[in-house]
């Protein structure tokens, strides 16, 4: 076990209970944040992205020898959303550079997932631009995690999004909700319809592909 004083990773994710914000009202309260490991600047070393529920997310650059540097602001990781959950590294636009997708499951105004597209590496530091809205991936559901894969075998990466309603279990009853789609809690499948390497465009094909999207998405 290496201390933060050696590694430079001083990140701590604290879940602070409040009178109206706790495990009794939100069953996913202790699900925690997320971690992604991958090479964001193509130097052969594994870098680290960690998400927080209450504080800022962090991107750490691996300097070698188990030493890391916080490059969050320098890399353009801005626009904090409340209650970040899962984070995924993937080369979304196929340009050979690692992009970042962050899931957010907070209050209405601070929800909306984020897509950081790698604009290139300068001085060993990756430069990112947030492009979720224009790419069609700024989903406003209660997202837990996302996975990128080529589901239609056309050579580019599509995305499956795992959502999960915060509705307490005792409120669900015994009704079969599988065929009832839920905007916030239902899982979704997004097809990559990007026409070229510069423009990024995803289409929600959940219903067409037969993805059940009930409020029990986990």
Regions found by a protein language model. Name each.
Residues 1-218:
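Beta-propeller-forming repeat regions
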